[in-house]
Amino acid sequence: MSLELTTPMTNSPLVQRVKEVHEQARLLATLDAAARNGALEQVACALEEAREEILAANAADCEQAKANQLNASLYARLELSPSKLAAAIAGVRQVAALPDPLGQRQLHRELDTGLILSRVTCPLGVLGVIFEARPDAVVQIASLAIKSGNGAILKGGQEASRSCQTIMQTIHRGLEKSAVPAGAIALLTQRSEISELLQLDQWVDLIIPRGSNEFVRYIQNNTRIPVLGHADGLCHLYVDRAADLEKAIAITLDAKTQYPAACNAIETLLVHRDIAEAFLPKVAAALQQAGVELRGDAIACDLVPMSLASEADWATEYCDLILAIKVVPDLDAALDHIATYGSGHTEAIVTEDAAAAARFLQEVDAAGVFHNCSTRFADGFRYGFGAEVGISTHKLPPRGPVGLEGLVTYKYQLVGNGHIVATYSGANARPFTHRDLDC
């Protein structure tokens, strides 16, 4: 995909909508925590009241998706079960219960008597969130945007159009009973609007794409607006020579089969050669019973009947019940493989060797590095963030699951009493005190 970046028409319907969100976001940013939390409770109540309406809209989307032969991983994201919707609603209330991310003083310093510097958190402004399927993302993103004082413009995939529109209408009904302006949260419905939205860097402060590798790379390559997200979720699980094999089997099954379409599901299993003969037949039987197709290197294929993996398999994010397996001679080889093929998302080791675990945790370069637990824990809700807008694999923060802290920035506030720089310059310059104060 490619897109020529051009100056948008200032009078287009989309530009007018985005400008309206920008203006309403300015009002939202002035509201106190009680007002924003009250709005979230109204949204949660509205979603509960509209539960059947939302599920019916999603059922219609799913029926259409089946007719259109939507691929399995996208369909898994699209389907909104009663429990998934209930979890999304619970997430709204959990976000409301989190500490206020705004107005937090991170630095408080006296530069001189009567000249006080503060660094205080504030909203980013307007978020543009573009996602494939995932109707529950509308709930998550709207709640995080409201809590963090940001406006939000959402664009879901066409496959989820009924679900997203019904959810957004419900959110607006809740906001109309609150102090938060409903116009601060908007939903786009036309695919053609994406390319224009990506050009609106004057009014949109951050783009958050959620979807396939190709989709995220398209967004990253076609906008001047900062992009938060990850294009790949190629996660590994390394089973060390000192692993508890029962733990390793349970963790492997969970990390691959609990939700194979998730970006934090493993795609490659690395096994130390010293335990491969004892471990691989057992884990392969469990995986195959769960419907997983196995693709292994020559050593793995000698131990267990499976397809021979190609070079491409080590670099593939399947998002499906497919797992590549490689037998490695030692921890160094596992680290090298991860460094070569990993996407910087989440990597895990299973071992009872504390030194090996410590080295893995220290040396692997990823947003999440785990010991003796499933990669599926890489999630904002499970981390206690309430919800997440996405996962970032960038080196600069925010990194990993992005919740409220990743949706605020800060400003420096300096309060004086007629102070001027000339006082602190020249031969008789007055010295700064630079005394830290309590925050």
Swiss-Prot record:
Q: Which PROSITE patterns match?
A: PROA
Give the EC number(s) under which this enzyme is classified. 1.2.1.41
Pathway it belongs to? Amino-acid biosynthesis; L-proline biosynthesis; L-glutamate 5-semialdehyde from L-glutamate: step 2/2
Does Amino-acid biosynthesis appear among the keywords? Answer: yes
GO MF, any single term? NADP binding
Question: What is one GO cellular-component annotation here?
Answer: cytoplasm
Reactions catalysed: L-glutamate 5-semialdehyde + phosphate + NADP(+) = L-glutamyl 5-phosphate + NADPH + H(+)
- Family, as annotated: Belongs to the gamma-glutamyl phosphate reductase family.
Q: Which HAMAP family match?
A: ProA
Q: What is this protein called?
A: Gamma-glutamyl phosphate reductase
Q: Which organism is it from?
A: Thermosynechococcus vestitus (strain NIES-2133 / IAM M-273 / BP-1)
